Amino acid sequence: MEGKIIQVLGPVVDVEFESYLPAIFEALDINFEVNGVQKSLVLEVAAHLGGNRVRAIAMDMTEGLVRNQIVKARGKMIEVPVGEEVLGRIFNVVGESIDNLEPLKPSLTWPIHRKAPSFEQQSTKTEMFETGIKVIDLLAPYSKGGKVGLFGGAGVGKTVIIMELIHNVAYKHNGYSVFAGVGERTREGNDLYFEMKEGGVLDKVALCYGQMNEPPGARNRIAFTGLTMAEYFRDEKGLDVLMFIDNIFRYAQSGAEMSALLGRIPSAVGYQPTLAGEMGKLQERIASTKNGSITSVQAVYVPADDLTDPAPASVFAHLDATTVLNRKIAEKGIYPAVDPLDSTSRILSPQMIGEKHYEIATGIQQVLQKYKDLQDIIAILGLDELSEEDKKIVERARKIEKFLSQPFFVAEVFTGSPGKYVTLQETLEGFGGILEGKYDHIPENAFYMVGSIQEVLEKAKNMKNS
């Protein structure tokens, strides 16, 4: 099953076979030499050109390829290692370890293109996924097997939230996580690895990187590599897995680059005509089955802050919750810098999370919204000009703002304060009490960077004694 190269167009390679036609998505291998160095390259068949000619996408740089070089058809798709041996390791798109450790000899591999779970296999019951992060659990709760969009600019704490979620899933749910770096900066991928090592969560996570400097084929398919590893834990081990994709926009962007090279006519804003279908193909595989679930957190870059751009717009259709990080909140020193009024969740309704949770969440949002509306008056006239009722609202809102902050386990190394996991029960008790006015007598500084309301009371007591 050998063929030869007839044309190289950047990351796209045309191959002709004599008596064999490889299937779409089949892997092809090329072994060649560049400046005396042996190299191997994997291609994936993307289109049939007629006759026994195929157009394939390269999963690595194509420098050094020449016409008439021998290409071998694998007879199967790209397969990547799965199972517990992938934890704590970094992989590239074709499943090779790239962390300079002992190369992995996998005992089990799965193809990266797989069918989404059928209707019979899917689980339809909606269950809340407790993260242990107060602001998320209270105001924009995640659902098991749901998809969450994490929106935020540079330096507001997306990575820290991702690491904390990985930590909490590992320690409280005894679960595993998979991180797919799609079109990531190499530096960020490197930082994440070492931060996870320091944070002690590396042995519970598998990392797959297709970085910014790699060809579009690698950046696009890396999402499937990570997803396949997560699917194994869901289907074979019956676990609830967390799947992180950073950044889902780059998945769409690399698809657009590939589409142009394959000669397809572009659609709106130069994107591929198959954008919605490609996004659906990936997102539909992220689902809850009767065995286990994959809950995904996807960082979404919004080009030029335009939410109507086809790429982010195609992601929105699939999301169950959005966690929006706000720089203004980060500047106040409140971490995690989640915007309590901008973040949304599909399961924030009395039928899904219960009457009590819903009432407390909407009550908190009303107080914060009222405080936001009063800011102009306070700026012009000062606090003293407000009515007694409004003064009370401002006091409570400031306490709520401070109480939405929380020390993280993975940030212990930097902050020096031990991390806190707050159960939903404790979160509701604390915020419910603030709304009822139970803690009106406690100074607002006692609410800053603590876990449960019990700690607030202890902190207030210590402040009083000192």
UniProtKB/Swiss-Prot annotation:
SUPFAM superfamilies: C-terminal domain of alpha and beta subunits of F1 ATP synthase, N-terminal domain of alpha and beta subunits of F1 ATP synthase, P-loop containing nucleoside triphosphate hydrolases. It catalyses: ATP + H2O + 4 H(+)(in) = ADP + phosphate + 5 H(+)(out). GO terms for cellular component: plasma membrane; proton-transporting ATP synthase complex. It is an enzyme of class 7 (translocase). It is found in: Cell inner membrane. Its EC number is 7.1.2.2. It is a peripheral membrane protein. Its main location: membrane. Signal peptide: none annotated. InterPro entries: AAA+_ATPase, ATP-synt_VA_C, ATP_synth_F1_bsu, ATPase_a/bsu_AS, ATPase_alpha/beta_chains, ATPase_F1/V1/A1_a/bsu_N, ATPase_F1/V1/A1_a/bsu_N_sf, ATPase_F1/V1/A1_a/bsu_nucl-bd. Belongs to the ATPase alpha/beta chains family. HAMAP family: ATP_synth_beta_bact. F-type ATPases have 2 components, CF(1) - the catalytic core - and CF(0) - the membrane proton channel. CF(1) has five subunits: alpha(3), beta(3), gamma(1), delta(1), epsilon(1). CF(0) has three main subunits: a(1), b(2) and c(9-12). The alpha and beta chains form an alternating ring which encloses part of the gamma chain. CF(1) is attached to CF(0) by a central stalk formed by the gamma and epsilon chains, while a peripheral stalk is formed by the delta and b chains. This is ATP synthase subunit beta. It comes from Helicobacter pylori (strain HPAG1).
